[in-house]
């Protein structure tokens, strides 16, 4: 990346945070984040889709076309390629034009988001698109009490995002949209304190984890994060290594619905096509989604620290392929080792997992001691790295990799 690119990115990020703070008014940033992030995503997919339709032909201006010229064939082909469809009238640029004067802005936006999601119905991309805008509630009181107030706030967000200079879409050598999105997420997380850390791993730590998991590999079949949050760890693998290194794409599971949507948006924003990623919603420990996709050559994860799980209250779990080999389940009040054993069972013979863990699992007795012994006796542990809390801003304790 040249210095101009870095300067452009830094300027963009300071502008975007300023706008994010201006448009939220008195609403807490954490509660308002889905509107800013969702609008940024809406602009991105609009420009990405326009770029695809125009195909580099300067004589085509998709935003100026009439919706009537779109044939069934064009639409079908576009959805198979991009995963979704956006009519010219639905593009971000066209909604932004009349944002402040449109009395139906909130209902128009809701209808457009429904239409974009609905365009993927019965197509292979349906799972990746469905519900993407679910958290963008245009009727929310966080936007204001009356329709007029809501529309004014929505228009301010749209115009703010419109004012950001991402340069020419085709010429973007760095993931400016993706970087802006991740920058916003990290700032929201830092300002929210502990709650933010549950869905975002700081960039310096995620870089290290990606490097540990992929170092020395000439290719990996696919990469997986069993507690993927907003997808930042998976995406570091793409940033640190040539995307071609990861042959079959990116897989992740996330338990929180809002965060699951952020992760899917994050994949698109980093130019990962719908057929190259699969993010699932659900509890990895109880209902793992990717049993049929294993083994994985690379696993990266920063699972929640010492959370409760059903453990021994579910008698079937001790016979689960993931936990049976250790002969004991992780304690009900500390699921840390359950995530580690889950990752281990999903690794290929040549695979490597890099996982951020709470230090307690290295010295507590009982079941955790037995699991430690199992891991060490079978030579599954390559190394343990201590990371100071300053590298994990949202958590004021030490961590180990």
Regions found by a protein language model. Give the residues of each.
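Non-catalytic, mostly N-terminal accessory regions of nucleic-acid modification and defense proteins
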Residues: 1-208, 212-213, 217, 275-286, ...
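Soluble or luminal CAZymes and related metallo-dependent hydrolases
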Residues: 11, 15, 255, 335
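Glycine-rich S-adenosyl-L-methionine
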Residues: 322-346
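Glycine-rich, charged/polar anion/phosphate-binding loops
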Residues: 339-342, 385-389
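Short glycine-dipeptide loop
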Residues: 347-352
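Conserved small/polar residues in nucleotide/adenosyl-binding loops
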Residues: 390-397
């Amino acid at each position: 990346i040249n210095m101009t690119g870095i300067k452009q990115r830094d300027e963009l990020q300071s502008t975007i945070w300023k706008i994010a703070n201006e448009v939220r008014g008195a609403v807490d940033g954490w509660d308002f984040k889905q509107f800013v992030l969702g609008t940024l995503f809406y602009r991105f997919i609009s420009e990405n889709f326009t770029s695809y339709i125009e195909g580099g032909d300067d004589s085509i201006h998709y935003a100026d076309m009439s919706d009537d010229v779109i044939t069934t064939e064009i639409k079908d082909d576009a959805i198979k390629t991009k995963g979704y469809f956006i009519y010219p009238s639905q593009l971000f640029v066209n909604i932004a034009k009349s944002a402040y004067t449109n009395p139906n802005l909130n209902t128009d936006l809701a209808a457009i988001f429904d239409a974009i999601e609905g365009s993927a119905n019965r197509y292979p991309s349906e799972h990746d698109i469905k519900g993407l805008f679910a958290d963008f509630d245009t009727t929310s009181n966080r936007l204001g009490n009356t329709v007029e107030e809501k529309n004014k706030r929505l228009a301010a967000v749209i115009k703010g995002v419109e004012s950001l200079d991402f340069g020419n879409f085709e010429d973007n050598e760095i993931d400016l949209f993706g970087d802006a999105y991740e920058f916003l997420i990290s700032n929201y997380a830092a300002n929210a304190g502990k709650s933010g850390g549950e869905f975002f791993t700081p960039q310096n730590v995620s870089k290290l984890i990606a490097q540990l998991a992929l170092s020395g590999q000439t290719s990996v079949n696919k990469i997986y994060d069993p507690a993927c949050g907003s997808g930042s760890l998976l995406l570091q693998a793409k940033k640190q290594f040539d995307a071609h290194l990861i042959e079959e794409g990116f897989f992740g599971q996330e338990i929180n619905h809002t965060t699951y949507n952020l992760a899917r948006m994050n994949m698109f924003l980093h130019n990962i096509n719908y057929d190259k990623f699969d993010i699932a919603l659900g509890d990895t420990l109880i209902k793992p989604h990717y049993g049929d996709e294993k083994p994985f050559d690379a696993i990266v994860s920063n699972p929640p620290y010492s959370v409760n799980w059903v453990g021994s209250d579910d008698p079937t779990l001790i016979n689960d392929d993931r936990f049976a080999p250790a002969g004991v389940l992780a304690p009900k009040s500390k699921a840390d080792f359950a995530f580690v054993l889950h990752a281990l069972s999903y690794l290929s013979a040549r695979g490597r997992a890099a996982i951020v863990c709470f230090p307690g699992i290295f010295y507590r007795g009982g079941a955790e001691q037995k699991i430690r012994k199992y891991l060490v006796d079978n030579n599954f542990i390559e190394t343990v790295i201590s990371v100071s809390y300053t590298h994990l801003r949202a958590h004021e304790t030490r961590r180990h990799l």
